[in-house]
């Protein structure tokens, strides 16, 4: 399976140990089960985010296709910039057998959260990182991967909308 960051594991262990001593619960097996559950939720979150990349890209692809088919589309709608939807990093993720298997086995999906996926897409499309990505002369796998790294670092991580969604759903993390 995917390697979870050592710092995250240490934090989870310390949280469980703290809880173990605070509650006065002498059952070490309960603490171990809590740790394993917490780590599993971290894995789920990791895979949810990978799946989110694919879902956001697929949504944009559907939007571009719909615009092409409308009555009297503009030249830009007929010939849109497809760099975002042709991102090689996303294509690699979408074909990753480990990701597909995990998503299928765990039943992970964004299908019930299309409005959230649309909001994430809108946030990305309105970001300076996206504008720079489209203008970048260099077109390579590395620039595609770097785009998504920056999006996660500067747009998704710490985004109030995403944090609110996670706290409301309590499905992951």
Can you annotate each of these PLM segments?
Residues 170-172:
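Conserved small/polar residues in nucleotide/adenosyl-binding loops
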Residues 3-162:
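N-terminal, charged low-complexity regulatory/assembly segments
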Residues 166-168:
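Short, flexible active-site loops
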């Amino acid at each position: 399976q995917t390697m979870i960051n050592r710092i995250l594991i240490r934090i989870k262990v310390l949280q469980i140990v703290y809880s173990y001593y605070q509650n006065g619960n002498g059952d070490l097996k309960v603490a171990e089960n809590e740790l394993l559950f917490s780590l599993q939720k971290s894995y789920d979150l990791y895979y949810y985010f990978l799946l989110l990349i694919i879902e956001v890209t697929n949504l944009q692809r559907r939007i571009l296709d719909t615009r092409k088919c409308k009555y009297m589309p503009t030249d830009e709608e007929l010939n849109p910039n497809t760099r975002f939807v042709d991102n090689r990093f996303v294509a690699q993720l979408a074909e990753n057998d480990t990701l597909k298997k995990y998503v299928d086995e765990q039943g992970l999906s964004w299908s019930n959260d299309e409005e959230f996926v649309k909001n994430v897409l809108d946030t990305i499309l309105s970001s300076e990182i996206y504008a720079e990505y489209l203008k970048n002369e260099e077109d390579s796998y590395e620039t595609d991967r770097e785009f998504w790294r920056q999006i996660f670092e500067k747009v998704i991580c710490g985004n109030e909308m995403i944090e609110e969604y996670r706290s409301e759903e309590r499905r992951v993390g």
